[in-house]
Amino acid sequence: MTFNVNVLTIFPEMFPGTLSHSIIGRALNKGLWNLNVIDIRSFAKDKHKTVDDRPYGGGPGMIMKADVIGSAIDEVLSKNKNTKLIYMSPSGIKLNQDISGQLTHFSNITILCGRFEGIDKRILDFYDFHEISIGDYILSGGEVACMVLIETCVRLIPGVVSNTQSIRDESFTLDYKLEYPQYTRPAKWRGLEVPDVLLSGNHKKINLWKANQSYCITKQRRPELTGTIDGDIYE
């Protein structure tokens, strides 16, 4: 099953952007996932291709128009009525690895990228959108957040990352722990040495060290995640 992604944006030239590089770009070229970028502005009816207007009730900035966005969404739905609709929003559920994994089970998703002060709320009321946030901060638009979401999903598609163990060992993938420290050659650098256990060849001890490091780092930096981990085996 190919993972198909539709992106609704007023800046189609931003795509594929970073998604055309490295393993994500190679997967795109191989057809492991498809990208369909739709210019919202092309659905505006006036000669100026207006996509925004002043907010009712006053307030700063401009709001993206429901009629224009709605026409763009209808175009997507006419070709795939079962596409999963997603709106990148700081008010949404915070993205995590589990959400990304769930989204890869859909053959077609559509991501709406807002701009200005946001979109007319009636879009979210009329269509079955799922709002997703990539963090507690504000960006100028949804395009960068959209690329983050796409990359987190595409990496989980079978065949994209050649070493599946890399996926299993990454932060948040296994029991929501942060990843353990990594080292490579040389064994000594500027007075700093690789931990002896990693040079021992004893895989049982190495695995225990990795698990312990992962747990301790998670407990120190993201203590809210340790509630999902059985700490008795690490402490």
From Swiss-Prot:
Gene Ontology molecular functions: tRNA (guanine(37)-N1)-methyltransferase activity
Keyword Nucleotidyltransferase set for record: no
BP GO terms, sorted: tRNA N1-guanine methylation
Class in the EC hierarchy, top level: transferase
Top-level taxon in the UniProt lineage: Bacteria
Short name of any one Pfam family annotated for the protein: tRNA_m1G_MT
Binding, S-adenosyl-L-methionine: G114, I134, G135, D136, Y137, I138, L139
Enzyme Commission number(s) of this protein: 2.1.1.228
Catalytic activity: guanosine(37) in tRNA + S-adenosyl-L-methionine = N(1)-methylguanosine(37) in tRNA + S-adenosyl-L-homocysteine + H(+)
Assigned keywords, A-Z: Cytoplasm, Methyltransferase, S-adenosyl-L-methionine, Transferase, tRNA processing
Quaternary structure (record): Homodimer.
Function text: Specifically methylates guanosine-37 in various tRNAs.
Protein name: tRNA (guanine-N(1)-)-methyltransferase
Provenance organism: Ehrlichia chaffeensis (strain ATCC CRL-10679 / Arkansas)
